[in-house]
Amino acid sequence: MEYAILFATSLVITVLAASGFAPAHGWNKGTATFYGGADASGTMGGACGYGNLYTAGYGTNTAALSSVLFNDGWSCGQCYLIMCDAAATPQWCRAGAAVTITATNLCPPNWALPSNSGGWCNPPRPHFDMAEPAWLQIGIYKAGIIPVLYQQVKCWRQGGIRFTMGGFNFFELVLVSNVAGSGSVRSVSVKGGSTGWITLNRNWGANWQCNSGLVGQALSFAVTSTGGQTLYIYNVVPSWWSFGMTFTSNQQFSY
């Protein structure tokens, strides 16, 4: 039985590597539950600020991360390859299956419950509260919670990096989304048509802020991924922008 499980795990890794999903690091152990309903409608919004995950391009392969993984929002947009740990609970795993999810939300601690009985997202547990359609790709519904093997992998996105202009008056709150490569952002700077480069501070989730009164100016961005790649995206936001508008660049991260 143990040989069969090890063989199945090896087969999954081999197939994933051949399909371009080869992970960069070793497997880690964690657990996973699900939320949001069969259509994942309950996963919209979230602590990363992506809003409607359907229109934002993230779909239903998403998850809320426990605080140890969420890292106060710095992990927003990262991708994780997850498979059920068949060596631990073969009866609750879909044999040979794996899924890649995007971190879009926080699964907060529940201090009223012990971490091994309901407080699944309590530190220091690495836990994924996955959108139900994603979870069902690797687990059997009746189980409710399963042990998993996971690791961070490269993100693949359709189209370029997106910038959504939030805020009001002299306060700009820029949502940076649809990030490929490492998936998450280390730093952002903005340059208006009549300004130099201005460093933005991360406010919450994937939202970056400045107080520079940039309305009426075309905007360029310098974005550095957590993978260490920096892109200069010039004039991606035209001078006629207004709050609430989203603009898609023609550039994308590779790492």
Swiss-Prot record:
Pfam families referenced in this protein's UniProt entry, alphabetically: DPBB_1, Expansin_C
UniProt entry keywords in alphabetical sequence: Cell wall, Cell wall biogenesis/degradation, Membrane, Secreted, Signal
Domain (Expansin-like CBD): residue spans on this chain: 170-249
Entry-linked InterPro entries: Expan_Lol_pI, Expansin, Expansin/allergen_DPBB_dom, Expansin_CBD, Expansin_CBD_sf, RlpA-like_DPBB, RlpA-like_sf
Tissue: Expressed in panicles and flowers.
Keyword NADP: no
Superkingdom as given in the UniProt entry: Eukaryota
Record's subcellular location: Secreted, Cell wall; Membrane
Annotated GO biological process: plant-type cell wall loosening
Gene3D superfamilies linked to this entry: Expansin, cellulose-binding-like domain, RlpA-like domain
Membrane topology, record value: Peripheral membrane protein
Signal sequence region: 1-26
Ranges of residues in domain Expansin-like EG45: 45-160
Known function: May cause loosening and extension of plant cell walls by disrupting non-covalent bonding between cellulose microfibrils and matrix glucans. No enzymatic activity has been found. May be required for rapid internodal elongation in deepwater rice during submergence.
Family from the record: Belongs to the expansin family. Expansin A subfamily.
Protein name: Expansin-A25
UniProt gene name: EXPA25
